[in-house]
Amino acid sequence: MTKDDCIFCKLANGVFPTNVIYEDEDFTAILDAAPAAKGHALILPKQHSDNLYELPDETAAKVLPVAKKIANAMKKTFNCDGVNVQQNNEAAAGQSVFHFHVHGIPRFKKDGISLLWKPGKPTDAEQAETCKLLKDALQ
């Protein structure tokens, strides 16, 4: 299913022209229009899901191999020092277009791009409590 008002549905399905770097039956990968770095790409499923929570398992199983292909192409093309493969869910996590997508961002030492966080220092008891809560939710 696609959504009529979703820009990423339209880009993934060729309704609007864009810079396509990869396409198969399920996905289109395009250059980000507002890149964090040269070569920053978005992997877009052709079928609409707002986020990871709604993504069909069969689509989820196929997206990481595509991300791997894109990351390898970035490494080969740009000889970058690393590649971020990132996926955001909901506005609080940085999602700005509500169509599931994965970012691939070529990275270089000292490129000034900050996607890192300050590591926390939870106690063993806090970790045990958090672990139990998540395990219970997975039951």
Positions of PLM-derived features:
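HIT superfamily nucleotide-processing domains
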Residues: 1-139
